[in-house]
Amino acid sequence: VSICTAQREIENYIRRLIAQRIDGVFIVGMPPLSDEKYHEIIFNMVEAGIRVLINGIILKDSKEISHIFVDHMTGIDKAVSYLKSMGHTHIAMVSTFGRNSNFDIRDRMFFSAMDKYLPDSPKIFVSETGIRNPDMDSSYSLTKRLLTDHPEVTAVICLNDLMAYGVIQAAAYFNKSVPDELSVIGMDDIYISRNFNPTVTSIGFDKREYGMMAFELLYNHIKKNIIKDIDIRTELYIRSSTGLAPGLK
């Protein structure tokens, strides 16, 4: 078992993996490639006899690839429901994926939850397709644009916790207090979110369960040629980055 990262020269890296005749690979993150190039690389591995497990929806209809899905639909549904219960009606999502991305469907999940709980509220989605890294820097710049164009926004949902930290920094730039004037929700519930100031409300999942299920899926694919997709349930962990909408305190 090897754990590795390939941020650069991805195609050369994959060619080396194929040459080494590895048994299987678990792809967790999305490389900065076009959809077509990414699909080509995946199927090159499949054709070489490598068993492939993918985190997420990419090539979800393939009968040759196993998938593990984090059930963000339930988590985003809980997040929007919770924000509504706290009086928020102007809720935005900040993303580094464009609308209707082949790599990520959380934008559609957000729109669905808004239709369900706040059908009369605006659906505010800010993204930049040229940005591939969902990190603090990207969310900081996106949130500055968001709060300039939509100062009425009182809550923001982010693709991950790192982006939530960037939103909190951007709020400080506009002298907006978190959570008194802006509530912020991240995803993944990484360890630092429990110690960040303020602590970050996050859509999270059991990392141990995720790791065990990923290993089991790939092992069964390699040893028994069992191809399977599974969902990992999510929860909303409420902390101090969210609160009542302004004017309701």
Q: Locations of the language-model features?
A:
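Periplasmic-binding protein-like
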Residues: 22-32, 53, 92-94, 150-160, ...
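Residue-level detector of anion-binding/catalytic polar loops
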Residues: 51, 89, 177
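Glycine-rich phosphate/diphosphate-binding loops that line cofactor/substrate pockets in enzymes
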Residues: 80-91
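Glycosyltransferases and closely related glycan-assembly transferases
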Residues: 40-49, 111-115, 167-176
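Flexible loop/turn connectors
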Residues: 121-122, 142-249
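Hinge/beta->alpha junction and helix N-cap segments in small-molecule ligand-binding domains
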Residues: 2-12, 31-32, 57, 67-78, ...
